[in-house]
Amino acid sequence: MPRVSTHLVKLAAAALCALLLSAVAASATSRIKDLANIEGIRQNQLIGYGLVVGLNGTGDTLNNIPFTKQSLQAMLERMGVNIRGATIRTGNVAAVMVTGNLPPFATQGTRMDVTVSALGDAKNLQGGTLLVTPLLGADGNVYAVAQGSLAIGGFQAEGEAAKITRGVPTVGRIANGAIIEREIEFALNRLPNVRLALRNADFTTAKRIAAAVNDYLGTKCAEPLDPSTVQLSIPGEFKGNAVALLTEIEQLQVEPDQAAKIVIDERSGIIVMGRDVRVATVAVAQGNLTVSISESPQVSQPNPLGGGRTVVTPNSRIGVTEDGKKLAVVKDGVSLQQLVDGLNSLGIGPRDLIGILQAIKAAGAIEADIEVM
C-alpha cells in the first residue's frame, strides 16, 4: 500500500483551513432576528414600594427615616395591630423600591425577576424578606405582585474599630419573585402590517432586509420607510397568522452595513474601531515633555560653641526631559490595522492614541465618526 506523504497531508490541511476561513469571512451575514425587533413587542418597566423585614439590626433607623415608620404602622394597622402613639424601636425593617421588567406576551400566573433597592439608611439587606409588594406600570395599574427572600451580591462586616464592605449590600434580587397578575394585550395576528425596527439605523441594511424578504416571499410586500424601519404588509396566505410569517422571516440571512465609527472611553483608555475606518494622508508627531521636581531638605548644624541654632534649608531640584519627537506619515486610505501598527511603532499608548485620533479627525483626515463615552 503506497504511503501518503506527510508534506502533502499538511498542504491539504492548510488549504482546507484557508477555504474554511475564506468562507467564514465571505459570509459575514446575520439573521434578521438579530438585526431588528418587531415594533410593539417590548418589555414594560414596573415599580413598587415595599418593606423588607428580618434584617439583623441593619435596617432603617426609624427616627431618621419617617416614611419607613409610617409604612410599618400602616401595615400593622391593616393587620389589626394598633400601635398609634407607641414607640417603635427596631432595626430589622427597611423601606425599599422594587423594580422589574414585564416580558412581552407574559400571561397571568407566570413569574418574573425583581430587583430590590434600599430607600432609607439601611446598611445591609442580607437575610431580609420582601413583604407583598404590588408592582405598577406607567399607567398606574398593578401588573404583578412581588414577595420573597433576597439574594445579595455584596456583604458588609464591621467591628468596633474596622468595617469591610464588598459590592453593594443594599441592593438584592429575587429570582422569579413576582407573579404576573395582569396581561398586556397585543393582537399580533390581527395586524394588517408589521414594522421591523432596526437596532442600528442604516439605509443600506434596511434596503437589504426589505430585498431579502421580498425575494423569499416572491412578492413586494416589504419596503424601507427610513433607516431604522422596514414595513411588512402581511400577504394574503398569512392573514390572521402573522406569527408563522415572522417565524420564517426572522431566519433570513442579511449582510448588515455600518458606518465607519470609532468609540473612545476616556476613563479606561479603551478604543474600539470598526473595520471600515480609513485615514487620508496625514503626518503625526508625538513627543512627551516630563517635568520632575524633587525636594531634599538639608540640615545646617552649627559648631558646638558657636552660639548658633540648627536650621533646615530647602534644596529643590527641577529637571525637564523631553522624549525624542518622532514624525510619521500615514498614507492615504490605510486600514484600521495599518493605522494601529503605525501608531504603535511610534511608541504611542492608548491614552495618547485618543488625542491623536481626535486631532486627525479635526484635521479632516479620518473618515469615521468619533464617539467619546
From Swiss-Prot:
Q: InterPro entries from the entry?
A: Flag_FlgI
Q: Which residues form the signal peptide?
A: 1-28
Question: What does the record list as GO biological process?
Answer: bacterial-type flagellum-dependent cell motility
Any GO MF annotation of the entry? structural molecule activity
Q: According to its UniProt record, where is this protein located? A: Periplasm; Bacterial flagellum basal body
Q: What is its main location?
A: periplasm
Annotated Gene Ontology cellular components are: bacterial-type flagellum basal body, distal rod, P ring; outer membrane-bounded periplasmic space
Any idea which UniProt keywords this protein has? Bacterial flagellum, Periplasm, Signal
Matching entries from Pfam families are given as: FlgI
Query: This protein's superkingdom?
Result: Bacteria
Xref: PANTHER family: FLAGELLAR P-RING PERIPLASMIC PROTEIN FLGI (PTHR30381), FLAGELLAR P-RING PROTEIN (PTHR30381:SF0)
Functional summary from the UniProt entry: Assembles around the rod to form the L-ring and probably protects the motor/basal body from shearing forces during rotation.
Query: Subunit info?
Result: The basal body constitutes a major portion of the flagellar organelle and consists of four rings (L,P,S, and M) mounted on a central rod.
Question: Family assignment?
Answer: Belongs to the FlgI family.
Q: What is this protein called?
A: Flagellar P-ring protein
Source organism of this protein record? Rhodopseudomonas palustris (strain TIE-1)
Taxonomy, top ranks, is: Bacteria, Pseudomonadati, Pseudomonadota, Alphaproteobacteria, Hyphomicrobiales
